[in-house]
Amino acid sequence: MPFRDLILFNLSKFLLTEDKESLEIVSSLCRGFEISYDDLITYFPDRKYHKYIYKVFEHVDLSEELSMEFHDTTLRDLVYLKLYKYSKCIRPCYKLGDNLKGIVVIKDRNIYIREANDDLIEYLLKEYTPQIYTYSNEHVPIAGSKLILCGFSQVTFMAYTTSHITTNKKVDVLVSKKCIDKLVDPINYQILQNLFDKGSGTINKILRKIFYSVTGGQTP
C-alpha cells in the first residue's frame, strides 16, 4: 500500500474532523518519509486547508510504531468521512395533504401500507386503484421502490439513496451508525461505488481514489 495514500487518508480525516490521532499519524509519516509542507499542498491546493496542514509540521508528539497498511475499518472510515456533515432534505409534495399519516411502499404494482390513517388509505385508493394495483400484507422491499412518507421528519440515508421518496412535509436525511454499517456490507458495493463517484473537490477526489484502492476497483 503506497505510504502516500496513508498520508492522504489520515490528512483528509484530520482536515474534516480535526482528529488528533490522524494528525499524529500524518506528522509521523511525513517526518519518516521526508514529506514537506510544499509536497502536501500540491495535493490540497485550496488555501482553506493550508493553515491546518501547517499544523502537521508543528506537531511534536510522534508515533513510535506505525502500520503501513490500512486497518480493517478503513472502508467504514471512508464512508463516514464521505458522509461527514452530510446535509440533505426532501421537500414536500403539496399534492399530499398535511392530514395524511403513514408509510407506503410501491414497487411495480405491489403496495405495502404501514401505520396509515384513514385519510392516507382514502388517497391511495383514489390514486392507485385496486383494479390495477395489489395491496399486499407482505413487506415490499424498499430498494427500487416508490416510498410515500406522511407525517415523518426524518428518513435514513439508505432509504433515500435506494428509493424514490415523496413526502407531505420537509424530511431530513439521516446518516446513522446503523446506516453506515449497512452501506459497508458487500451486497451494497454498487451503492458505495455510486456514492464515491459523485462529488468534486480535493477531499472527495482523494477519498474516491482510496476507496477504489481499498476495494480493489479501478478509479474512473
From Swiss-Prot:
Pfam families: Chordopox_G2 (PF05796). It comes from the Viruses. Keywords: Early protein, Elongation factor, Protein biosynthesis. Involved in postreplicative transcription elongation on intermediate and late genes. Interacts with H5 and A18. Might be part of a transcription complex composed at least of OPG087, OPG145, and OPG110. Belongs to the orthopoxvirus OPG087 family. This is Late transcription elongation factor OPG087. It comes from Variola virus (isolate Human/India/Ind3/1967). The lineage of its organism: Viruses, Varidnaviria, Bamfordvirae, Nucleocytoviricota, Pokkesviricetes.
